[in-house]
A protein has these predicted regions:
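C-terminal solvent-exposed extensions
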Residues: 66, 70-73, 77-78, 84, ...
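Amphipathic, coiled-coil-like alpha-helical scaffolding segments used for oligomerization/assembly
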Residues: 121-179
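N-terminal post-signal-peptidase region of extra-cytosolic proteins
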Residues: 55, 67, 71-76, 84-88, ...
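Extracytoplasmic/secreted envelope proteins and their assembly/folding machinery
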Residues: 85, 124-132, 147-151, 155, ...
C-alpha cells in the first residue's frame, strides 16, 4: 500500500478516536460557557480536574506552538484495572489540524509489551513512558478519562437511547434486547459492567456504544444556538471534573479555545494496524515506523 493510500485509509472515522475527541469538545464547551455560567464555577471545574503529570514537557501555548496530548481512557472492568484506549494527539496551528494516533491497547508492541499489561503494573505513568519511548516525542499535556464515571456525563447531558443487542441483568437492572433508555449514572454504569469472564468483548462494545451516544449529546450541545439554564451547564461542568483528570489548566483552556479552536475542529486519524501471530495481535516495527513518520509530519 503506497503512502497516499495509507494516509487516506487512516483518515476514515474510527470509533475510539471519535469517542476520545469528546474531551476536546468538552473543553471548548466549558470555556465558552463562561459568558453564561459564573466565571468562578468554570475556573473551579478546571481546578478540580487539574492533576500534575511531572514527566510532561512544558510548552508556552500563548506562542501558538504545536502541542501534544496523551489521552488515556481507563477504568475497572469486573474488578480489574483496564486501559480501554490510548491516543496521542498533535494540535498544530500552522496546519489548522489535530491528528490523533491510536494505540491498540491489547496488541503486543515492538517492545514485546501491551499497553494493558503496562497499565496493570505501572498505571498511567507506565503508559506515558511507553508511548514516549515508542515514538521518541515530547508529551506536553495529559488527559485521563475514568470510564467508570462516564455515566455522570450521560446523566448531565440528558441521557441516551440506544440499541441493545442482547438481554442481560447487571447490578439490579434489567436490560432487554432492543431499544434501551439510559438516564442515570447508575444505569449507565450497570450497562457497561462486565458480567463474567466471557463478557469482556461484549462489555467493551457496550462501553464504545455508550461513548458514541454521549458523543452525539456533546455535539448537539456544542451546536446549540440557545443557551440552557445555569443548572444545566453547572451539572455538565461537575460531571466533567468528576470524569476527567488533566494538566490542562483553566488558563491553558482559555488559550486553546482562542488560538487553537480551528485546529481542534479539523481532525485526522492514524491507526496502528495489527497482524495475527499465533493467535495474538501484534504491531510490527515496520508498521510503527510508518505511522510514526506520519505523526512526526503532523508536528511540523
Amino acid at each position: 500500500m503506497n503512502q497516499k493510500k495509507r494516509r487516506h485509509y487512516r483518515k476514515k472515522k474510527h470509533t475510539v478516536l471519535k469517542v476520545i475527541s469528546i474531551i476536546f469538545v468538552l473543553v471548548i464547551i466549558a470555556v465558552a460557557s463562561i459568558a453564561y455560567v459564573a466565571y468562578r464555577n468554570v475556573e473551579s471545574t478546571f481546578s478540580t480536574s487539574y492533576e500534575n503529570f511531572p514527566k510532561t514537557t512544558s510548552i508556552d501555548l500563548k506562542k501558538s506552538k504545536t502541542f501534544t496530548t496523551l489521552i488515556i481512557a481507563t477504568g475497572k472492568n469486573n474488578s480489574k484495572n483496564t486501559a480501554y484506549a490510548t491516543v496521542l494527539a498533535s494540535t498544530n496551528v500552522k496546519t489548522n489540524q489535530t491528528t490523533f494516533m491510536n494505540f491498540p491497547v491489547f496488541a503486543t508492541m515492538p517492545n514485546q509489551k501491551t499497553i494493558t499489561e503496562v497499565y496493570n503494573t505501572n498505571g498511567d505513568d507506565g503508559i506515558f513512558q511507553m508511548v514516549k519511548d515508542l515514538l521518541n516525542v515530547s508529551i506536553n499535556k495529559v488527559i485521563q478519562i475514568d470510564v467508570n464515571k462516564m455515566g455522570s456525563l450521560v446523566q448531565a447531558t440528558g441521557g441516551i437511547t440506544m440499541q441493545n443487542p442482547k438481554a442481560f441483568n447487571a447490578e439490579g437492572y434489567e436490560f432487554k434486547q432492543g431499544t434501551v433508555n439510559l438516564q442515570t449514572a447508575d444505569q449507565v454504569q450497570a450497562y457497561m459492567t462486565q458480567i463474567d469472564d466471557t463478557d469482556l468483548d461484549a462489555s467493551i462494545t457496550r462501553i464504545q456504544n455508550v461513548s458514541m451516544e454521549l458523543y452525539g449529546n456533546i455535539q448537539k450541545i456544542a451546536h446549540m444556538k440557545k443557551l440552557e439554564s445555569f443548572n444545566y451547564y453547572r451539572e455538565i461542568l461537575y460531571a466533567f471534573s468528576n470524569t476527567v483528570k488533566t494538566n490542562i489548566s483553566f488558563n491553558d483552556a482559555k488559550t486553546i479555545v482562542m488560538s487553537y479552536n480551528t485546529a481542534l475542529k479539523n481532525t485526522s486519524k492514524l491507526n496502528l494496524h495489527t497482524t495475527d501471530e499465533n493467535g495474538a495481535k501484534v504491531v510490527s516495527q515496520t508498521e510503527l515506523d510508518s505511522v510514526k513518520t506520519l505523526f512526526e509530519k503532523s508536528l511540523k
